[in-house]
Each structure stands twice: as C-alpha cells, then as structure tokens.
Amino acid sequence: MFRLPKKVIDDIQKYDEKLKQFLSGKINSTFFRGVRVPWGFYSQRGGKLLMSRLRIPAGILTPSQLKAIGIAAKNFADGKLHITTRQDIQIHNVPFENSIKIIDYLKDFNISPRGGGGNTVRNITCCYLSGICSKEKTEVYKMVWGLTEYLLSLEESLNLPRKFKIAFSGCEKDCAFTGVNDVGVIALDDGKFKVLCGGGMGAKSAVGKVLCENIDQDEVYYVIKSVFNVYNKYGDRKNRHHNRLRFLIEDIGWEKFYDLYKKELDNIRGNEYIPIRYENDVNVLPELPDAGLIGCSEDETYNLFIKHNTAKQKQKGYYYAEIRIPVGEISSEELLKLCEIEGFVPTLIFRTTQRQNIVLTNIPYDKMFYVYEKIKSIFSDFLYPETVLDIVSCKAATTCNLGICNAIDLAKNIIEELNSKLDTTVIEKLKDVKININGCPNACGQHPIGTISFSGLARRVYNRSVPFYKIYLGGKIDGENTKLAQEKGILPARVIPKFISELVLTLQGSLNIEYLTFNIEQLIKKYSYVPSYEEDKNYYIDFGKTEEFSFAGLSQGECGAGVIDMIEADLESAKQSLIKSKEKNLEITDIKDALIYSARALLVVKGVDPKSEEETIFGFIDKFINTGICNPEFKNLNEIYQNIVSNKITKEQAYEYTQKFYQEVKKIYSLMDSNFNFVARFKEIISTEDKRQKHPKTLTYDLRGTPCPINYVKIKLKLEELNIGDVLEVYLDDGEPIKNVPKSLINDGQEILKIEQVKNFFKVLIKRKV
C-alpha cells in the first residue's frame, strides 16, 4: 500500500507552529493562507470554516483508512464529506483549530491533505479499476503510489508556478482522462508506455500532445521529472491566470518546449537516480475453489444492482460493486457503516472514482447478496453508476468561494427529473451519456469532457440577477485524441432539469453528435425565455435556496495560494501599519511593525523563515542589501530599527525612513521575474572582515545529524557566501539527505562534482555555478 513519506510527517510540526501563530494573532489570515492551502485546507464560503482535501493516491483505500476518514470527519468537523473528480475525499466545515487534528490523526493511516491545494503536484489519479481490470496492460496503481511517494518527498513539489496534475491509464481506453492532465501516462502492450503532455481543463482547456511513446516503465519517471523540472524552471509564477504548463507551451511553442525537455531529460539521466518503491501491491487475494456466478433473486432491485453495479474482476471468483454516490456527497455515518462490510468480507478494498463514486472490490461471488443488503440499508439511491443518472458536480456555491451557481442542487433536481421520466430500458441505452456540471467557469466538475455539460454564470434580467448556465456538447475521452465539449448557448438555471429531460428522451440511445447538436439548438431556443419577477420569481432564485439570487459569498479563490500570497500579505500589512500610524499621530509601534513587515515580505523567496524581528532585519540585510538587490541607502536598516526600539529617533524620521523602505521593497518585488529571481541594481556590499577570496576555494561543511530540508537550506545559504566556481564539501547522512539534497541542488543549477560514501555518511563535492 501507499506510504506517507517521512518528509510529510516531519513537516507537520511546521504547520502546527504557523497555525498557533495565526490563532494567536501573530500572523494574519492572508499570510496563513499561503501556509494552509498547500496543506490542502481551503477557506469555505464565509471564511469561518475550512475544507480539508485528503489526497487518495490512485483512489485506493483500505477499510481502516476509510473508517479513519469517517472518524476524522465526525470528530473534527460535522461529518459532511465530498468525493472529488480527482479521487480525493474532502472533509467540510472544519474549524481552523481542528485542521492540525485532522493532519495528526490521519498520518497514522498514511493519509494526508499535503499537496491537496495550492501550487503543488496534486493527487495522481489512475483508472479506478487498476489492479482488477482484465483489460489493463499494466497495473498502473503501483506506479501512482511509487511516484506519489517520490514527489511528496521533494520540497519543490510544494512550490511550483501553479498546480501540476498527473494521470495514469492502464490501457488506451483511457479511464483516467490522461489527455486533459499536465502529464498523462497510458500503458501499451509489452510493458511499454506513452506519455502525453500539456493538457488541462479550466481557462483555455487543451488536449495534451504525445511527448514520447513505447518507453519502458522506469523511463516514465524520468520523463515526468523532466517535464516537472522544465515547468518549475520556466513557468510563470507571477501571472496567476496564465501559469499552467499548457500556457508555458503555448507561449514558447511545442518545439522550444520539447528541446528544453530533452536537455533536462539528458541531464537527469546523467546525474540523478529516481528511487521508486515497487513493493507496494495491494494484498494478494486468497484463491477461491471455483469461479462461481452470482445468481438472480426475487428481489428486483438486487437483480438491477447485479446488472448495473457489479462486474467480474480478473481475479477468479471475485467481483466488484460500484455504488453511485449522487454528486459525491456522503456522510461520516454512511462511511462508517460501509466499513462494517469488512467484517463479512475480509478481503475488501475501497476505491474512489472520477465520477465521484465508491467501488467495493475483492468481493467473493458468494458474498455479493450480503454486500447488496448492507448497501441498501445505507443508501437510498445507489443504482446505475456510470450512466446518464451519474451526474458529476463540483461543490459550487454551497461552500466554494468561486461558486456562482448552486450546481449541487441543480444536479439533484436533474436526477429527480430523469428518475421520474426514464425507465430501465432507456437508462441502459443512455449509459454512455455523461452529464457534468460546474458552478463557475472553472473545471472542477470537468465540464470540458462531458457529453452534455454546464458551467455557471449570471445574467441581468429586468435589472435583477438570474443564475444561468453555459451549455456544452460533445466531450469525449480518447487520450491525445480527446474531444473537448463545445459551447452551444446559455439557459437560465431554473429550466435546465426539464431541458435535459427532454433532450435525453429524444436520443433513444443515439449519440450522433450532429443529430444531438440540432436537437440541443432547438431546445435552447424553446427554453430560453425568462419571465419577469412578477410572473415567476423562481427564475430569480437558485436551486436549494429560498432567497433571491445574488453574488453574496463570492470571494477570492485560493487554488494558487503560496509564496505570492505571503509576499503580498506582508506588503499589505506594512501599508496598513503606515496608514494606522499616520491616523494615530505617527504611533511608533505601528511604524516599527511596517518596517518589519516590509523587511520580511521577500525573505520567503530566499528560503528564510525568521523567528524574531532581529532575524528579519539581518535576513533582509544579508539577502537583499549586501547582494546589491536593495538600494544601499538602507544599509543602516538595523541601526534605524534599534533606534526605533529604544526611542532614539523622532517619530517623523522613523516614519519617513520606513515609508521610503516600504516603497523600495515594493520596487524590488515589481522587478522580480516569473521565476522569483531579483535584479541586482547596485554593487554588492562586502565588509572588510568578510571579503571573499577572488580565487576558487574549497570549504568543508558537516551536516551529519541535520534532517531534510534544513540541510538543503543551510547548503543554499552557505553557497551564497561563496564565489562562482568555489567548491563546497558537504557531509550528509545516508537515507533521505543523500537521496534528496544533491537532486535539489542540481535543480537549482549547481554542479555535483563527486559523491563518495565514507562508512555511514557521504561526502558531496558541490561547485557553485549560479
């Protein structure tokens, strides 16, 4: 099974420290957002509670893990959960102070929200039947687990230009939607693989191109790391609306991108080793005496369940059962009851799907009726997964800050409408019709790949706001040949259920897109009328609401939260402190705060996390003044700070200096490039007693006993003290230090001259190149 890397466990203490600082008022909410979002904690609508997105690599969970998630949701929140389109599970309505409790409790079950949000490598998905499907060429879930363990061990995986999504499909049927991921891997015959690159959904959705094919399994990891490195080096970190991998490829062109990728691949092959753990299988199933068949019953619902929810596994005598979880909404109570099935089916393993369902696997044929009875006692609406009734929806306006419309309740109303109009025969004919809904233009509900799909927006009608949806048609998954759904028009939200019902009834099992296009265009015209408020006020009220539709609750999205947020939070705090000081007759405490906020703002880019005001001041002097990035007129920064603290400077002088310093820091920030590099506009300041040697030198630095990533940060700081061409000899421990630190330094552009093992530690020779 998947193992949570030690780095993730070690980093929990850092999160705990920042949480305590936030709760005690030592850091503000914007700064803390840059900390919590990469830990998978998003602010919900209203800002008072959090959502915790737990990453579930490959979507596979043991009963004990699923039970732990249910317990965490019950004990640390209000028991409401949501299954996502990337096979994650979200715990909703989490008080801020309970976020650390979720992290700490679930780590013992190898579950974590780490990397569930922000500019990180997101949950790596794969076919939800990987390992039990008779059609798969390779059991790709094992690759997902190994790659996830590796990437979560890398510091750079948590500070990318933007989110980075990876998917694995076990065959060319492409159940994992590889074509709409940043990197998609498809298993071919004879243990070979094809890798796609540059796909994605959301703003300017795109289908990935073939980067390479017919490569071996071991090569896949090097290819992915090469793409990862290119994106990390050249992706635009400052423009939040244009910083996905597909935009980098668009800006520089495929040929230039491919050249960068090939150079990076050659560099990694020659200098790195990617350690992937292969001993990560799901437990081997005991052999059954015979294959066995599941019999029929007088219970008609059971017969429908067998027909539509179950199928054989490739393992003799075993079956799986997929439970349709309407719009992915489930409670902790339901999860915990579901886990009780393990008592009768000890081989049970759970899986989450891209259509927000739960699959029970490894069920012996003679125990299926018991499983059905248990499922029936828990859920009231569980038949027909992967059909027209299996509607995908994001959380939308129920909890999401960006949600315009209430997609969740629209989906529930569509399901209710279809259930009242469709019989079993029609549902069977429409099994390939996929309906996807988003509450806003973003693609959390994956509307670009739906057969029929919707994204929320608003329009003014008779001077009132009305919830509307864009309508899309024709999405189809097929690797690099994936077709994205095309926009066909807009309709008011209130008519969508009847519109869908009439549309699917005209299909009669035909998915001819030309025929469907004609019908959809005619129906859009039919349903496009919006009556006045006096005539029918329901048009002006969203599904699931009683009040009139409005934009109340909308706020800034947090998906890209990270370094930029932390910088801008400190700059804004500095600005507000200066304003407060002026309002209070130049209050000296506010002036001092503005000075500290200004000095701290950019230190995060240099990997400095000061624990005191003094460390902040000296950190800025060392990283920005002495290096020529900041105007040397501020070389007396520490002297001014000390004078402010000891009241040896007038309020007017302190305010004027701090105001100028704040403006200088803002200017430095404005000149920072998209890769967080700064322009050295002035000469370096070198003290007489600390002059650097003009000829190359070699220093020794013993970091034995220093854990990751502290050892890496210390080496970076030490290298900055050296001239270009100088050599640093470092002593590193075996294990994580020797595995991770050299690779990180190579990614920084440094040169590793030699790695030599000496008894139980390693000597590493590093040449400063940049």
Please name every model-derived segment.
Residues 1-580:
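Peripheral terminal and linker regions in Fe-S/redox and tRNA-modifying enzymes
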Residues 108, 748-756:
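A glycine-rich helix N-cap at a beta->alpha junction
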Residues 562-579, 599-687:
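Long, charged low-complexity segments
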Residues 585-604:
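Short, hydrophobic, well-ordered secondary-structure elements
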Residues 689-722:
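An N-terminal amphipathic alpha-helical segment
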Residues 710-717, 734-750:
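Amphipathic alpha-helical interaction surfaces in cytosolic regulatory modules
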Residues 763-770:
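Core SAM-dependent methyltransferase catalytic element
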